[in-house]
């Protein structure tokens, strides 16, 4: 039976269509989102052997869209080192641009902001909320859109930082250093090998280090969290993102405010998200809204026809999944 593996087991040494750095003519929505995504770095110590492990991941600011926030969503395995360590044995940092490390592989002074874990799912579905512990760790929050409202064929963009190997000589962790890839939503799937977690299957390539990062729609709303890939003999062109609804549930449990965009409702918060995503005044935003609606309809019809000719079958079962730090 085919098996779904964690990103650590994928053949990410193969070239993937991810672009590093901000490109000329980049979509303003993506350029805006870069300011909200952060590079995370963790270290765990085994209390018995004293052996230390390191990992990296990605997170993004949540709260009232466009306002500064020190609260971030990421994956549970990024925040905790996959739960391998006892309480107090894990340290987590938000890396700043041009971060440097000392001889013990800890971030040098001024290179990072210490973080604390607020709440996690304690395993599947692999989600965590963390908080940066100094003002330098604040970023503008992104709006969230329930994943179930995102139809097949929707254009999406994945953002993330490179994995641990990229930190050997320091870390380029600024907004301009993010890797970006684009694709479309292919399917909604309950991932049996990951605790029946609800996921979006998409074609925006992700690689090691993307774990916990955002999957955006064309309005700049986070519709899912990049977490898993598939074993190479299943697919090297499909990728898996957790429903953002899991992150919303954690925010609700802590009574933390955030901007939720609902496609089925014309609400002030939805319109505020449009203004934030495009940086436009109200009059121009309404014009853009009408134009976007027409464009989405035309593109959607074309993608629907293509999707019918390319059915996707993804077998479940096998080993338990788990993203890579």
Regions found by a protein language model. Name each.
Residues 60, 66, 151, 205-226:
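Catalytic nucleophile loop of clan PA
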Residues 309-325:
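Cytoplasmic C-terminal tails of single-pass
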Residues 140-198, 206-208, 228-237, 310-311:
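Flexible, gly/ser-rich surface segments that form the specificity/activation loops bordering the active-site cleft
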Residues 25-26, 43-75, 235-238:
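A conserved glycine-rich beta-strand in the N-terminal activation segment of trypsin-fold
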Residues 31-48, 156:
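A short, Trp-centered hydrophobic/proline-enriched beta-strand micro-motif
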Residues 24, 28-29, 60-62, 82-84, ...:
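Active-site substrate-binding loop(s) of clan PA
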Residues 25-29, 162-165, 225-307:
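C-terminal cap/linker of serine protease catalytic domains
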Residues 67-122:
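Catalytic-histidine neighborhood of serine endopeptidases
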């Amino acid at each position: 039976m085919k098996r779904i593996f964690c990103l650590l087991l994928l053949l990410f040494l193969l070239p993937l269509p991810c672009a590093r750095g901000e490109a000329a003519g980049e979509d303003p929505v993506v350029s805006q989102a870069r300011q909200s995504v952060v590079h995370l770095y963790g270290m765990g110590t085994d209390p018995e052997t004293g052996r230390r492990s390191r990992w990296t991941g990605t997170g993004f600011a949540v709260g009232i869209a466009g306002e500064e926030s020190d609260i971030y969503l990421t994956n549970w395995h990024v925040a905790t080192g996959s739960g391998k360590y006892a309480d107090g044995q894990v340290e987590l940092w938000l890396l700043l641009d041009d971060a440097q490390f000392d001889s013990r592989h800890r971030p040098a002074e001024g290179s990072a902001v210490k973080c604390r874990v607020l709440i996690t799912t304690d395993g599947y579905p692999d989600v965590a909320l963390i908080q940066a512990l100094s003002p330098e760790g604040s970023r503008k929050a992104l709006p969230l859109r329930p994943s179930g409202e995102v139809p097949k064929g929707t254009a999406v963009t994945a953002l993330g930082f490179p994995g641990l190997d990229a930190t050997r000589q320091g870390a380029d962790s600024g907004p301009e250093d993010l890797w970006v890839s684009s694709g479309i939503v292919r399917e909604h799937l309950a991932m049996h090998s990951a605790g029946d977690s609800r996921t979006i299957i998409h074609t925006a390539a992700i690689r090691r280090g993307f774990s916990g990062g955002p999957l955006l729609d064309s309005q700049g709303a986070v519709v899912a969290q990049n977490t898993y890939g598939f074993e190479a003999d299943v697919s090297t062109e499909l990728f898996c993102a957790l429903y953002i609804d899991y992150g919303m549930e954690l925010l609700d449990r802590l009574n933390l405010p955030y901007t939720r965009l609902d496609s089925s409702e014309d609400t002030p918060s939805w319109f505020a998200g449009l203004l934030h995503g495009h940086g436009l005044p109200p009059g121009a935003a309404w014009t853009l809204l009408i134009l976007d609606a027409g464009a989405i309809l035309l593109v959607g019809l074309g993608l629907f026809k293509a999707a019918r000719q390319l059915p996707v079958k993804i077998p479940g079962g096998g080993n338990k999944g788990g993203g890579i730090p």
